[in-house]
Amino acid sequence: MSFLSCEEMLAAARSQNISLAEAILRSDLAESRLTEEASRHAMHHLWHVMEATSRDYDPVQRSRSGLSGGDAAKVEQAHQAGKSYGGDYLAEVTTEALKTAECNACMKRIVAAPTAGSCGVLPAVLLPLSRAGEADEEAICDALYVAAGFGQVIAARATLAGAEGGCQAEVGAASAMAAAALCHLKGGTPEQCAAAAAMALGNLLGLVCDPVAGLVEVPCIKRNVVGAVNAVSCANMALAGVDYAIPCDEVIDAMGRVGSLLSPDLRETGQGGLAATPTGVRIAERLAEEA
C-alpha cells in the first residue's frame, strides 16, 4: 500500500468512482505485485486467525506473571446476569477486546493490528458483527483493507511503535483503524471513514505507554477496551454526519509530534506513569525476584 496520506486515499476512490476498500486493495496489488486472489486470501487468513484467537480463549488461563487472565469471562458473565450497560454489542466488544489482549499476554497467537499491544481493538469491533450475521466474511475483509489503509498512512506519517510514540501510536492507531473499518462496513463514505479515524485518534492523543514491569498487560489490556469502544462511538458520530475540525492527516501528524515530545519514561520503558507507582514498582520487583 503506497498511500502516504488519507487525502491521497480518498482522492483515489473519488477519481476512480470506487469504494475506499477497492482503492486500497488496488494500491496494495500495484505495490505487492500479488494477484487479487492472493491478496484477498491473505486478508481472509488474518480474519480467520482473529476468529481462532477468540475461540481459543481459556477463561481459567493466567499469564505467566499472574497479572492478567479471566477478565473477559467476568465481563461476559456479568452481562448475561444483567449487570452491565450498553447492550449486547458493547458488552461483546468489551469481552472480545479483553479476550484477544489476554490471549496475547498468555503467549497465544494473535494478529498484530497494528501491534501486539493493541491486538484486541480491531477484532473486538468486528467479531460481534460477524457472529450476528450483520456482515459476511467478504464485507469484513473489505473493512480490514480500509483499516490497513489508515494504518499504513499512520505508519508512514507518524509511528505505530509505543517505544517511539507512546500508547497513542498503538491503541490510538488501532482505534482509528477500527473506526474507519466500522464506518465503511455500514456504508459510510470515504470522507466519513476519514472523519471517524481522525476523531478516534484525536480522542487518544497523548496517551502514554507505561507498562508495569515492562509487560504488555497492565494497563495495556484494558486500554484495548477503551480503543475499541472509542472506535464504535467515533464511527457512530461519523455515520451520523458529524465532522471533525482537524483533517485526518493533520491529526496523524500531530500524533507523531506529540510522541516525539513524550519523555522516554512514557514510551514503553516501564519507568514512568503507572509503572512508576509504588504498586507498579512492587510488582516489578516481585516478578524480578521470581524470575
Enumerate the predicted regions with their spans.
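Generic N-terminal targeting/processing segments that precede catalytic cores or assembly contacts
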Residues: 1-108, 131-132, 241, 248-291
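Glycine- and small hydrophobic-enriched segments that form the cores of compact globular domains
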Residues: 85, 114-119, 131, 135-142, ...
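Active-site-adjacent structural elements in folded domains
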Residues: 107-110, 160-166, 218
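Conserved phosphate/anionic-ligand binding catalytic regions in large, soluble enzymes, centered on
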Residues: 107-125, 169-174
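Glycine- and acidic-residue-rich phosphate-binding/metal-coordinating active-site segment common to enzymes
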Residues: 144, 150-163, 167-177, 182
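Alpha-helical support elements that line or immediately flank enzyme active sites
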Residues: 123-134, 179-187
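Functionally critical mobile loop/hinge segments
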Residues: 184-291
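Acidic-glycine-rich active-site phosphate/pyrophosphate-binding loop
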Residues: 87-104, 139-158, 203-211, 246-249, ...
